């Protein structure tokens, strides 16, 4: 049994200072595949739209858009409609990256780099709205409240927002992957103990590995993945709204 991170599939050697070599990992390849699948799905759902006699495909597309609009309006208000594509993209990409493991590919969300990249985007937006709302000097002055010696703690509090978002999502997804792997290994050992005494190929029967891992995968990959995507997007909406000074 092995529990390893994403493998490096190919390395492109460069002479760029600081950045170093460009490594193509399982995370990167799986993310590209998910993005390609989501792009194809979006193009398919958004093609040949009609005002009357809409197809089931168009009805499904409209339902998704309406639910996304309602989600953003409920959590952020009507002043943040421009962030509907961002919230929707993060949600779709998160679910896609979680579910890609169902077909045997590496799940990008089991790599902290994926969640960290999303969290950095959210952090930049939070900082933008805080500075836009209060001004750069007022924002910097706020880091000194209530007394100047609290500045390091206030800075740490600002940085902890993207860190906590990234680790929350990553930890839940990775824990599901680890538990599924441990369960699969345990079931294989149990099968060997029970059927190992049989002669020939019968001793190699992995009966307990059939069916049971599918149920655990259904929870961790489908249900758990959707829940974590929902939580991440909800926190994104709330933090951006709060940074903009909206009640």
PLM regions: where:
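Selective transmembrane helix interface/packing segments
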Residues: 1-247
């Amino acid at each position: 049994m092995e529990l390893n991170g994403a493998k490096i599939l190919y390395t492109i050697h460069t002479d760029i200072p600081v950045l170093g070599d460009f490594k193509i990992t399982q995370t990167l390849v799986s993310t590209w595949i998910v993005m390609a699948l989501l792009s194809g799905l979006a193009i398919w759902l958004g093609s040949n739209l009609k005002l009357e006699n809409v197809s089931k495909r168009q009805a499904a597309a409209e339902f998704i858009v309406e639910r996304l609009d309602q989600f953003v309006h409920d959590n952020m208000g009507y002043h943040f409609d421009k962030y509907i594509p961002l919230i929707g993209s993060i949600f779709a990409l998160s679910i896609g990256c979680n579910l890609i493991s169902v077909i045997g590919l590496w799940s990008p969300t089991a790599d902290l780099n994926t969640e960290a990249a999303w969290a950095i985007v959210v952090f930049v937006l939070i900082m933008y709205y805080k500075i836009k709302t209060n001004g750069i000097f007022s924002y910097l002055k706020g880091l000194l409240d209530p007394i100047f010696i609290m500045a390091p703690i206030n800075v740490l509090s600002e940085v902890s927002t993207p860190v906590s978002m990234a680790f929350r999502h990553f930890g839940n997804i990775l824990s599901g992957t680890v538990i599924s792997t441990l369960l699969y290994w345990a079931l294989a050992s149990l099968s060997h103990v029970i059927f190992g005494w049989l002669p020939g190929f019968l001793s190699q029967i992995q009966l307990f590995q059939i069916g049971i891992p599918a149920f655990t995968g259904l929870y961790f990959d489908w249900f758990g993945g959707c829940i974590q995507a929902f939580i991440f997007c909800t926190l994104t909406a709330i933090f951006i709204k709060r940074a903009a000074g909206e009640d």
